[in-house]
């Protein structure tokens, strides 16, 4: 039985974490995660994140987000994210997918391309190779990109309280990150779906629901294919 990996991406303050949780609640309220789907298969709904989706990852998350910016070199940062992902894929994602779970993941490989590639200016080819190594080729079935102007998102994020290490970066960095997400969406239109995150929280949630409805038939045909 095969599960689904659905990723939520976006710049700081785009609302992706809020929307991921609302999506989880909606799926469970509609029978997923607590019963049988339309094909009689049990589909648990699980929520995870990168970095920090495993015990090892929690330590890496603290180092990456709470540490002082000048103490972590860009290539070191890239390798730490790759280490977190490699552990996450083997310890959590693959086992959950084998159980047929619908996984909602807060950030995945596209974030590394956008932040460390476009934002930090590291080699995109190198990042793509590291992503392949870390994931073993595991890609998302769907990535929801919550598209929000970088300046607006950064203001939202900083209003939450003390800015983390990534949020402390200047606006130019976050604009490059936004450009990276836009380029990825243009390059992979079947996998990455753009959501206008400038709309109200409820409007964004309804837009995500509609995307799920459009893809349910395709997804479940995949889920029940022979192993």
Q: Where are each of the predicted segments found?
A:
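Conserved lysine of the Walker
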Residues: 16
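NTP-dependent small-molecule kinase module
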Residues: 22-26, 151-227
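Walker A (P-loop) phosphate-binding loop of P-loop NTPases
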Residues: 13
């Amino acid at each position: 039985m095969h599960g689904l990996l659905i990723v939520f991406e976006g710049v700081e303050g785009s609302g992706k974490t809020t929307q991921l949780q609302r999506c989880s609640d909606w799926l469970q309220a509609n029978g997923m995660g607590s019963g049988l789907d339309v094909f009689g298969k049990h589909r648990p709904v699980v929520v995870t994140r990168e970095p920090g989706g495993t015990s090892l990852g929690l330590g890496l998350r603290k180092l990456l987000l709470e540490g002082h910016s000048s103490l972590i070199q860009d290539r070191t940062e890239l390798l730490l994210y790759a280490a977190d992902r490699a552990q996450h894929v083997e310890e959590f994602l693959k086992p959950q997918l084998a159980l047929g779970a619908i996984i909602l993941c807060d950030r995945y490989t596209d974030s590394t391309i956008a932040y460390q590639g476009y934002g930090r200016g590291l080699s995109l080819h190198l990042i793509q190779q590291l992503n392949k190594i870390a994931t073993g080729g595991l890609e998302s079935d769907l990535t929801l990109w919550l598209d929000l102007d970088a300046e607006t998102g950064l203001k939202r994020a900083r209003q939450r309280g003390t800015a983390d290490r990534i949020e402390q970066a200047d606006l130019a960095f976050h604009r490059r990150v936004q450009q990276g997400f836009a380029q990825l969406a243009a390059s992979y239109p079947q996998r990455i779906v753009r959501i206008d995150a400038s709309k109200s929280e409820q409007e964004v949630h309804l837009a995500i629901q509609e995307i799920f409805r459009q893809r349910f038939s395709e997804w479940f045909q995949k889920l029940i294919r022979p192993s």
